[in-house]
Regions:
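Outer-membrane beta-barrel domain signature
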Residues: 23-24, 55-57, 76-78, 97-102, ...
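Residues that define the transmembrane beta-barrel architecture of outer-membrane proteins
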Residues: 21, 29-33, 44, 58-64, ...
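Transmembrane beta-strands of outer-membrane beta-barrel proteins
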Residues: 23-27, 46-50, 83-91, 105-107, ...
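Cleavable N-terminal export/targeting peptides
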Residues: 1-22
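Predominantly the C-terminal beta-signal and adjacent terminal strand-loop region
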Residues: 118-154
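Transmembrane beta-strands of outer-membrane beta-barrel pores
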Residues: 29-33, 41-43, 52-56, 70-72, ...
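Short loop/turn motifs that connect adjacent beta-strands in outer-membrane beta-barrel proteins
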Residues: 19-22, 44-45, 73-84, 99-101, ...
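Residues on the lipid-exposed face of transmembrane beta-strands in outer-membrane beta-barrel proteins
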Residues: 35-39, 64-70, 89-93, 109-115, ...
Length: 154
């Protein structure tokens, strides 16, 4: 009986902890499309984006970016919903296949503005810069993008 009570308390504790960690999933549309996932860690959040694309050079691209964003400010511009300015560092790994094959490793930085509605929808506009190396056809890699993200918060 004691083990059942301890097990029930652990399950309840993990459920409460999971409910207290807001997450969001959606699309990030900029130079291409990416699936975007955010996980709040206290005041800040981790963002992981992954995408597929076909570049202008005929190369099929697949890549993933992970960024730890710091919430810089949360101005109270509206009565409902929440605004937030954020910025953070991260890393990108990518692979290009086609006429030019390459592997890309890069540092990434992002700065953005988000609005979370009073219902579970979030919009954000961000600027992301990459700086790194490609092993293969392209020796140096430094693209940037401006993107709009739409996410469902849960």
């Amino acid at each position: 009986m004691k083990k059942i009570i301890v097990l029930a308390a652990l399950i309840l504790g993990f459920s409460v902890a999971a409910a207290a960690q807001p997450r969001a999933i959606g699309l990030r549309i900029g130079n291409g499309g990416e699936i975007s996932y955010q996980h709040t860690l206290g005041q800040n959040f981790l963002e992981v984006d992954g995408g597929l694309g076909l570049g202008f050079d005929g190369v099929f691209n697949v890549g993933a970016t992970g960024i730890y964003n710091f919430m810089i400010a949360q101005p109270q511009w509206t009565d409902r919903g929440e605004w937030g300015f954020y910025a953070g560092p991260g890393a990108t790994v990518g692979l290009g296949l086609g006429d030019a094959n390459y592997l890309t490793l890069a540092a990434a930085g992002m700065v953005g503005l988000e609005y979370t509605f009073w219902f579970p929808l979030q919009l954000s506009l961000d600027f992301r810069q990459h700086l790194g190396f490609s092993f293969g056809e392209k020796p140096f890699w430094a693209p940037s993008s401006i993107a709009l993200s739409v996410r469902y918060r849960f």
